[in-house]
């Protein structure tokens, strides 16, 4: 069941907005740290069951657990994978309790013994579902 941020009065909106932003920020950094573990199950647990993933290194839109698993099985297999978040901006939807976070990150990994550096931009949507912040949308593309 999807839970939104509480529908606050004008006086409490700022506090509620800050709490929502803090939850989404923590979820974003948890995602980056979990990617570095290269544990597919742990990464997938950060996504809502109906989340949409438009991944960095694939042209296929992933909209179910099996398709997201297929992508992360391949992506997380890269040796030494880390994700460094450089910049992000965020906003809270006043109606839906959804937090949108967009920014820039860099993936670094080794492929065939050669270090690969992939600067990318991202857009995540997070929602509080069953008392945890989950990814409901994730778009990532290589920087132009």
Annotated model-derived regions:
Residues 52, 114, 132-134:
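Residue-level signal for well-ordered, solvent-exposed loop/turn and beta-edge residues enriched
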Residues 105-111, 126-128:
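Beta-strand elements of well-folded, non-transmembrane domains
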Residues 1-49:
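Short, low-complexity N-terminal intrinsically disordered segments enriched in polar/charged residues
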Residues 2-7, 119-144:
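Short beta-strand edge/turn micro-motifs at domain boundaries
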Residues 21-22, 27, 40-97, 102-104, ...:
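A solvent-exposed, acidic/Ser-Thr-rich amphipathic alpha-helical stretch
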């Amino acid at each position: 069941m999807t839970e939104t941020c509480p529908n606050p009065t004008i006086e409490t909106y700022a506090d509620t907005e800050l709490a929502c932003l803090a939850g989404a920020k923590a979820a974003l950094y948890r995602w980056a740290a979990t990617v570095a573990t290269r544990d597919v199950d742990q990464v997938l647990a950060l996504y809502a069951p109906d989340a949409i993933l438009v991944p960095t290194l694939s042209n296929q839109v992933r909209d179910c657990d099996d398709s997201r698993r297929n992508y992360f099985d391949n992506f997380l297999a890269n040796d030494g994978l880390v994700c460094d978040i450089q910049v992000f901006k965020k906003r809270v939807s006043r109606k839906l309790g959804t937090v949108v976070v967009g920014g820039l990150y860099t993936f670094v990994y080794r492929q065939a013994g050669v270090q690969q550096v992939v600067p990318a931009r991202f857009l995540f949507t997070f929602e509080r579902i069953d008392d945890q912040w989950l990814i409901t949308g994730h778009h990532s593309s290589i920087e132009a």
